[in-house]
Structures are given as structure tokens and as C-alpha cells.
Amino acid sequence: MARTCVVTGKGTTAGNNVSHSHKKNRRIWKVNVITKKIFLEDENRWVRVKISTRALRTLRKKGLKVAIKDHGGDITAITPKKYVGITPKAQPVATA
């Protein structure tokens, strides 16, 4: 999905708008995702990451490794530069 946070995995969700008279209309909620350059200290380089603003606050408070670990993610999912923003399931399998 294009509008998905790499750190938390949050994506677009669907549900109902409920009016005062309890009529239900379908709608979607989009995640506030921005593209941000983050410095990886272990590799001494910058990486572009699609991250939600909520995850960015957590990242600034705790740091990249701790924020990813807290949300059950894997740091290797964002490390390869050409796979930034792609979920681990969608990455091609390396053949040896």
C-alpha cells in the first residue's frame, strides 16, 4: 500500500460516518504519512522512510531502533535503500 507507515505498519482504514439520525455512510481514514530522511548511526548514512507523524514523535523520543522494536517491526525492513517503504513480505527473495 502506498499510504503505509514503515515503522508502525499503520495503513488506510475503513468504517462508517454515523449521522445524528444514525444513517451510516462508508468512508476511509487515511494515515498522515510523510517521507522523512532518517540517519542510521550503525551504517553512517541517511535513509528515506515513509513514516506516520505519530511514529515520528515516538522516534524522536525513543530513537529509531527502540521505536521499531516497540511496534514489532524489523530494522532490516528499512535498511536496504532500494526497499524503503516496501513491506518485508513484498521484498524479492535473493537467489544464491
From Swiss-Prot:
Pfam families: Ribosomal_L28 (PF00830)
Organism: Leptospira biflexa serovar Patoc (strain Patoc 1 / ATCC 23582 / Paris)
GO cellular component terms, A-Z: ribonucleoprotein complex; ribosome
Name of the gene encoding the protein in the UniProt record: rpmB
GO MF annotations, alphabetized: structural constituent of ribosome
Family per similarity comment: Belongs to the bacterial ribosomal protein bL28 family.
Protein name per its UniProtKB record: Large ribosomal subunit protein bL28
InterPro entries in the cross-refs: Ribosomal_bL28, Ribosomal_bL28/bL31-like_sf, Ribosomal_bL28_bact-type, Ribosomal_bL28_sf
GO biological process, one term: translation
